[in-house]
């Protein structure tokens, strides 16, 4: 039986996705390669989303365990101003 592949972490998945997008944006990939890259990009996106959802769940659980701590939403406009 082949050894199990160790899943790559979020940062590696995100870096791979960014590199893939950059390659595709150059516009010089053959159609078949573009389709394979797109499929890989979808898989990487789903993996990143799943990891983010798991991290959010873990943070929420930790906050709830601490008691009356209020959660505030992330303000993208405020972050962009930094």
From Swiss-Prot:
Signal peptide start-end: none
Could you tell me what this protein does? Answer: Bidirectionally degrades single-stranded DNA into large acid-insoluble oligonucleotides, which are then degraded further into small acid-soluble oligonucleotides.
Q: Which reaction does it catalyse?
A: Exonucleolytic cleavage in either 5'- to 3'- or 3'- to 5'-direction to yield nucleoside 5'-phosphates
List, alphabetically, the GO terms of the cellular component aspect.
cytosol; exodeoxyribonuclease VII complex
What domain of life is recorded for the organism? Bacteria
The coding gene here is xseB
Q: Where in the cell is it found?
A: Cytoplasm
Q: Which GO terms describe its molecular function?
A: exodeoxyribonuclease VII activity
Record family assignment: Belongs to the XseB family.
At the top of the EC hierarchy, this enzyme's class is hydrolase
Q: What EC identifiers does the entry list?
A: 3.1.11.6
Can you supply a Gene Ontology BP term from the record?
DNA catabolic process
Assigned keywords, A-Z: Cytoplasm, Exonuclease, Hydrolase, Nuclease
In its UniProt entry, what is this protein called? Answer: Exodeoxyribonuclease 7 small subunit
Coiled coil feature spans:
none
User: Taxonomic lineage of this organism?
Assistant: Bacteria, Pseudomonadati, Pseudomonadota, Gammaproteobacteria, Cellvibrionales
Please tell me whether the keyword Hydrolase is annotated for this protein: yes
Q: What is known about its subunit structure?
A: Heterooligomer composed of large and small subunits.
């Amino acid at each position: 039986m082949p050894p199990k592949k160790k899943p790559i972490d979020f940062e590696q998945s995100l870096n791979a996705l960014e590199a893939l997008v950059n390659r595709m944006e150059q516009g010089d990939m053959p159609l078949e390669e573009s389709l394979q890259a797109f499929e890989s990009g979808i898989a990487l996106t789903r993996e990143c989303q799943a990891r983010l959802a798991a991290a959010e769940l873990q943070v929420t659980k930790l906050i709830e365990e601490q008691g009356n701590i209020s959660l505030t939403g992330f303000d993208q406009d405020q972050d962009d101003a930094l």
